[in-house]
Regions:
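Surface-exposed extracellular loop regions of Gram-negative outer-membrane beta-barrel proteins
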Residues: 113-134, 268-286, 301-333, 463, ...
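Residues on the lipid-exposed face of transmembrane beta-strands in outer-membrane beta-barrel proteins
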Residues: 108-112, 122, 151-157, 214-222, ...
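Outer-membrane beta-barrel transmembrane domain signature of Gram-negative proteins
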Residues: 203-219, 234, 239-321
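Hydrophobic h-region of N-terminal signal peptides that target proteins for export
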Residues: 10-18
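N-terminal periplasmic/intermembrane-space "pro-region" immediately following the signal or transit peptide
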Residues: 19-84, 642-649
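Outer-membrane beta-barrel translocator/receptor signature
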Residues: 75-76, 85-94, 98-136, 145-149
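Flexible loop and strand-edge segments within Gram-negative outer membrane beta-barrel domains
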Residues: 129-132, 138-146, 165-230, 234-250
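Exposed, low-structure sequence patches enriched in small/polar residues
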Residues: 89, 94-97, 322-324, 330-649
Length: 649
């Protein structure tokens, strides 16, 4: 019996050992964060550089704001450039389209053939709208055509260890002031209301501007593994000239020095970096100031602003843990006043579950100049001679977030930022303008800003890509004496900024030939300054407010202003005239051949274009169709030298 028991014990142990499969499970998922911004859903056409993929995309959607044409490159990345030029599938394309109502589109992109030393080409884009207002709602507003024409030339010279890059860009933006509503042009206030809808008067309220941008720089091609000093230095110049002869010169110098080293001979690295920035702005305004002892001499007023910033940082990395420490030292000079809003730089990144759950928290700051160029691109309907340009400072900005993958085809990213801001700019309807169709810029002296963003990107099935974005954006003003708290018109509300924004975009590729796209954007809970026509009151000798009467005994009417919200009723219980932002569109592309593509887009189906700044519905629905022709993949044959043949007799 004892022997049987021993044999059975050995047998069970053997079976158990056999059932135990020795293997290692590794949750290693390569994660590439895909950050999407809901504002990108409605961006206008961009000239995609085809070097990054073989399949070219031609997406076009109307944007509620004018596109930003900043000729300065993005953030400098250390040691990421491969000195070899990638071969293009098609290095050139031309795109033409025409839409309803009267919206021509033209694009051209050209690039030289594969060359290990040189890279040069051009990008051209034009989109405009010239149709008269269409529909019952649109006809309440005056005719306000727009046009956007951009040209960018670039040239790069690639050496063994460095790359010389340069570009020259020009943009002409045509924008009439917002199409003012006929509800405001009343005979009681304006003796000849038809005058304001004539072509002669419309030409007098143009707000066109020209932008010239030049950039030249030199950066190293070393990778992070090479123990060499990396550098990137560039000089840029921006010139703005408006229809009202306001001028802005902007000159900048950006520099970066970095060095990478191993961290104590273990699996980590040290990264040392110093960023240098110098910016100078010269603004010349069309209004004149008296000069001389008797004030008889007039000179165009000019403002000068200067910014110098030095930011040294150190980064340490061990596996999935990263630490960055540094300090930012900006020096700001404006109106004979110098400021130095120093801010800390610190960030911790932790890969809690590698590729699945990554956490980061940090603190930083920023100082930037509210330039005329930035204001015109964000809102081209600002008033002329807007001479209240300032530096916006943020000395403490706390941020954090989580990102990773839920599945192999689903990425997520949630981030939040809480900042203490000074001199934060906001747009406000210019109450001094005759037709209430242009905007001023006001500043909150002190306040805090909360910005929370969430993104979910998902490849639901093969060739079906979905992205959902959400944003919560709010402001809290701290200074009891700042503009918002002291001015009774606004009631201390941040104007024209939706507190909530939700965006969606999707793409489906069927049979590698048909591409279907859809996008949507919703923005709500925003405040706006709404002009209304109401009787004029005055205070009599007894202190009582009584209506002002004309010679016939009729009440005199004037313009009053209410601060209204798109989801809240007015204090009198009436529904607000401010509507939420609602914009969605669909698109279709048919890849006829490898070179020909036909496309059709329906934009602004909700007819809410250009309503970011209260109810100026200049544009309705837009349908645009066109074709794209790609070329430039053919082999370039070398030229043969011509030889003179000897005639035979």
């Amino acid at each position: 019996m004892k022997k049987i028991t021993v044999l059975l014990t050995i047998l069970f142990i053997g079976l158990g050992l056999r059932a135990q499969v020795v293997d290692s499970a590794q949750l290693l998922i390569k994660y590439v964060p895909k950050l999407a911004n809901s504002n990108k859903i409605n961006q206008q056409a961009v000239l995609n550089d085809t070097v990054v993929s073989e399949q070219m995309e031609f997406n076009y959607v109307i944007a509620p704001n004018k596109p930003d044409l900043d000729f300065a490159p993005g953030d400098m990345q250390v040691g990421k450039l491969n000195p070899e030029v990638k071969e293009r599938y098609y290095r050139n394309y031309i795109k033409v389209g025409f839409g309803y109502p009267i919206t021509p589109l033209a694009e051209l992109s050209m690039h030289n053939c594969q060359n290990p030393k040189y890279s040069y080409g051009l990008n051209f884009h034009h989109f405009s709208s010239w149709a008269e207002p269409i529909g019952k709602v649109q006809k309440k507003f005056a005719y306000a055509p727009t046009s956007d024409t951009r040209l960018n030339l670039f040239f790069n010279r690639i050496f063994k260890n460095h790359t010389l890059y340069s570009s020259v860009g020009y943009n002409h933006e045509l924008a009439n002031l917002y199409g003012y509503s006929k509800d405001w042009v009343l005979p009681e206030i304006y003796p000849n209301p038809d005058l304001y809808y004539s072509k002669e008067y419309r030409d007098s309220i143009k707000n066109n501007f020209n932008h010239l941008g030049v950039e030249i720089g030199l950066r190293s091609n070393y990778t992070a593994e090479e123990k060499r000093l990396k550098e990137d230095v560039r000089v840029n110049y921006d010139f703005i000239h408006t229809y009202w002869k306001n001028i802005e010169h902007g000159v900048g110098l950006k520099g970066m020095l970095a060095y990478d080293a191993k961290f104590l001979k273990i699996s980590g690295f040290q990264h040392y970096q110093v960023d240098l920035g110098i910016d100078y702005f010269n603004n010349v305004w069309n209004d004149s100031v008296p000069m001389g002892t008797d004030g008889s001499l007039l000179r165009r007023r000019a403002d000068n602003s200067f910014m110098f910033e030095l930011k040294p940082t150190m980064s340490f990395s061990i596996r999935e843990y990263h630490l960055t420490l540094g300090i930012g030292v900006p020096i700001l000079s404006q109106f004979n006043k110098t400021q130095c809003p120093v801010y800390p730089v610190a960030e911790v990144q932790m890969g809690l579950i590698r590729g699945i759950l990554n956490l980061y928290v940090g603190v930083d700051g920023r100082s930037s100049y509210t330039s005329l160029k930035d204001l015109l691109y964000e809102n081209p309907y600002v008033k002329p001679n807007i001479d209240t340009l300032r530096f916006t400072k943020s000395q403490i900005s706390l941020f954090g977030g989580v990102k990773g993958k839920i599945t192999d085809k689903m990425n997520y990213h949630v981030s939040a930022r809480y900042s203490y801001r000074r001199d934060l700019p906001f747009f406000m309807l210019d109450t001094a303008s005759l037709l209430k169709n242009q905007f001023d810029v006001v500043y909150a002296t002190k306040g805090t800003e909360l910005d929370v963003n969430a993104n979910l990107s998902w490849e639901a099935i093969n060739h079906l890509y979905l992205s959902l974005n959400a944003r919560y954006h709010d402001f809290f003003f701290l200074d009891d004496y700042d503009w918002f708290e002291s001015n009774a018109i606004t009631g201390g509300k941040p104007l024209y900024i939706p507190r909530w924004e939700i965006g969606f975009e999707g793409k489906y590729i069927w049979q590698s030939r048909y591409i279907f796209t859809a996008n949507a954007k919703v923005g709500f809970n925003r405040w706006a300054l709404v002009p209304t026509v109401s009787p004029v009151y005055y205070t009599d000798e007894s202190g009582t407010e009584v209506p002002l009467l004309d010679e016939n005994g009729n009440p005199v009417k004037g313009i009053a202003y209410n601060v209204e919200n798109d989801i809240h009723r007015n204090p009198d219980g009436e529904k607000s005239s401010v509507k939420p932002v609602l914009n969605f569109g669909v698109g279709f592309e048919y890849l006829i051949t490898k070179q020909f593509t036909a496309f059709a887009n329906i934009n602004n189906i909700g007819c809410q274009y250009a309503t970011n700044y209260y109810g100026f519905n200049n544009f309705g629905i837009n349908v645009i169709v066109g074709v794209t022709y790609s070329f430039g993949n053919e082999a370039i044959k070398p030229l043969r030298k011509k030889t003179s043949a000897t005639p035979k007799y």
